[in-house]
Amino acid sequence: NEHIYTLNMLGVENAYDILRKEMASDDVKFYCVGYSVKQYYQNDYPITNLEGHKCSKIRTELIATFLPEEVVDGLYAAVERAGLHVENLTLEPIAAINIAIPERFRLLNIALVDVGAGTSDISITKDGSIIAYGMIPAAGDELTECIAKHYLVDFQEADRMKCESTEQEEVEFQDIMGLPMTVKSSDIAEVVRENVQSITKQVAEKIIELNGDKSVSAVFVVGGGGKITGFTECLAEYLGVAKERVALRGSEVLREVTFLRQDLEIDSLLVTPIGIC
């Protein structure tokens, strides 16, 4: 185990050296926030796990992700102000994929899309490993802002309307003039339709880029933003895959998790937080 850990750390160190050379600047420092092993090699032969094997040479290919030190310092400061401390640091797509795509599925060419508030995080699996990570700066908040502007409500009210529109046929709200309103969920879906198309188009383009300029076989979608009406259908259309092969993942991948609260709704919103835990 010690040799494997050292091998991985050497890989991260090499990745950091490559990054520094590409940046051509010593002013910005970076912090590794996560890495995933693509493939191990035993005497130049690919192997899933090196542990317990004897050999004269070991090698690894891995993906390492770095953030500027200032960003990481900001994250730590926010946690400390809340009276907490950081136990571990990871990436949302790494956390989500450990729950949503078990290792037995990673032989398949699958994309995982975590549609959060400010970003849509993407990871790709193929031939038994995670081959790429990516991100686009567009997600649920863009839809919330669209609802806020259209119905003249504040951001929090618009976010509530967005969430409720995925669960019920009508949504009640009060605009900034204090007028009570009721709107059909289908009308909200129509209001954000162009934004949904824009986001899914960007996600599809990033998936194709990460996957070697070709589409994937299937897509799992997690996170709150992906629950909006039409999201999975639009993404399937832009990727050129059957609509049934782009789907939200929630309770299907959380069956082995025991929840203390029996009344908790088990859906795609919980996948990433549980992966982080």
Feature locations, PLM:
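Nucleotide/phosphate-binding catalytic cleft detector across ATP-hydrolyzing
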Residues: 1-110, 167-171, 182-189, 210, ...
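A polyampholytic, Gly/Pro-enriched intrinsically disordered region
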Residues: 20-28, 109-115, 157-161, 263-277
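Short hydrophobic/aromatic-rich motifs at helix boundaries and adjacent loops
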Residues: 46-49, 115-118, 175-178, 205
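Helical "lid/coupling" subdomains associated with nucleotide-phosphate turnover
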Residues: 63-67, 80, 87-91, 98-101, ...
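A generic alpha-helix surface/boundary motif
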Residues: 73, 141-142
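Gly/Thr-rich phosphate-binding beta-strand-loop-beta motif of the actin/hexokinase/Hsp70
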Residues: 103-132, 147
